[in-house]
Design a protein with these regions (language model features):
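Short loop/turn segments that flank or connect secondary-structure elements
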Residues: 1-253
Length: 253
């Protein structure tokens, strides 16, 4: 992966407050990384946003249930009460200079890592954001780096969607809860991503760029490659092996 060039990083010195004005969505990999880096339980930093639907057919790709009811949830980074109606991220550090810095920068969620860049088709664009006008000049950033990073992020959200779908099939057999309890879901995530990490470290470093690029090819077509039959996928050795490892980790093997 290419190193990020700090000299062209518009976030340095910015006071626009994305760390106190936005809810940050979390994928399972985010939860696993932060919990392991800080040696804390996910319940310390994960909050749950509720979305009621009429049936399970209306679930979004990242929505999970806890029982047979139609109530669904998705994970966001917890916040604390701030001033002026702001809700700073639980990990935001307020400096004497009135600047804000991330307390978990090396383990920050992938949504934070990519903000405010995204793909529009095959192009990288700056999506509407809290950033000052003109802060992100795409002629001055390393687009090769960002293409790989955004491809990696696409992959992690696809894996999360696959993990959530597997969980939802599991809990459809459970009776409706009398009291909400998110701990079983969080434990499921930690177990899956711990198994997946054992496989992740076995992927050759030089193989990742190709895997992310191929993943992006699928997600650009609104396809999660984990939902395809193996014969429909790519025959490249690292790609095929990685997909197999993900499926095995989610299945509990």
């Amino acid at each position: 992966m290419l190193p990020r060039e700090a000299k062209n990083n518009p976030c340095v010195g910015c006071l626009r407050g994305c760390c106190s004005k936005l809810l940050v969505g979390l994928c399972g990999y985010d939860v696993w990384r932060i919990a392991n880096a800080l040696h804390i339980r996910p319940t310390v930093f994960v909050a749950f946003a509720r979305r009621d639907e009429t049936s399970r057919d209306d679930f979004g790709p990242y929505d999970f249930g806890l029982d047979t009811s139609a109530s669904t949830y998705h994970m966001v980074l917890n916040v604390r009460q701030g001033t002026d109606s702001t809700y700073p991220c639980i990990f935001a550090l307020d400096l004497p200079t009135h600047e804000v810095r991330c307390g978990v920068y090396s383990s920050r969620p992938i949504s934070c890592q990519s903000y405010p860049l995204t793909f529009a088709g095959e192009e990288i664009i700056v999506k509407p954001s809290l950033c000052p006008d003109g802060a992100w000049d795409l002629t001055k950033v390393n687009l090769l780096y960002w293409r790989e990073e955004l491809g990696r992020h696409n992959m992690e959200w696809s894996i999360h969607s696959f993990v959530v779908e597997t969980w939802n099939k599991k809990v459809m057999k459970e009776a409706q809860l009398q009291k909400l309890d998110f701990r079983p879901f969080l434990d499921f995530l930690l177990d899956v991503y711990q198994r997946l990490e054992l496989a992740r470290v076995e992927v050759p470093t030089e193989a990742w760029s190709g895997i992310w690029e191929q993943w992006r090819w699928f997600t650009a077509k609104q396809v999660n490659p984990l939902l395809l039959q193996e014969s429909e996928s790519i025959a490249a050795k690292s790609w095929h092996w990685w997909l197999k490892c993900i499926r095995k980790a989610v299945a509990g093997h």
